[in-house]
Amino acid sequence: DFFFLPRRTDAEISATIVELYKTRLPRTYGQLTENGIQIITPSRRGEAGTEHLNRLLQAALNPAERGRAEMSFRDKLFRVGDRVMQTRNNYDVLWEDDETDEADVPEPEDVSPGRGRARPPQVAGREWDEEPESERGGVFNGDIGVIVDIDVPERTMRVRFDDRVAIYTSDMLDDLEHAWAVTVHKSQGSEYPFVIMPMYSASTLLLTRNLLYTAVTRAQRMVILVGRESVIRTMVENNRQSMRY
């Protein structure tokens, strides 16, 4: 299914996207939206880019709450329940079995993991069933998970990817970012049931037919474009091949 929701300003675009994610899609499609809504943007920057949208979505879906731990790191605020993405391969992260008691984790309105963790590379000379769980390492670029624990005094976090938990120390947090909204560049190779894409003014180097095609083809069930028709027209007519973010 395909829908286009015209909006004039970037503020209207971002407000509509938050409403779609938080209320309209879950109300209409129910459980089909669990783990399945992904916002894909041309750029990180701007009022409808990933950085601003993720701040809005964190406030709407996983707000500050008594008993819900949070920790600041540079310009980011991480909170238990946040949806996050690993941004580069790191083979030094240690894994542990996910023994999180779901009743003990404050549940935001959407803590869907989205794309699961890729399997870590096999250690040479070992079969997988011979390797102790505590020794399996590695988290990979594009993996999406949910923060399940934050130890503020120790400056560490635990992030659940599928059925295991990765332990993050403070020196690893540069490689973690919020993932309710991601760039088209970061979405490559993934698929999602529902894709929402803002159509807002960005660099013409980014507003290309190839980028629009890549974003739209990430959707398995539904695509919703939100914004200005003129931006869609620009992207369709711009046949540049490079795609950066």
Task: List each model region and its residues.
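Conserved helicase motor core of P-loop NTPases
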Residues: D1-G114, R119-R136
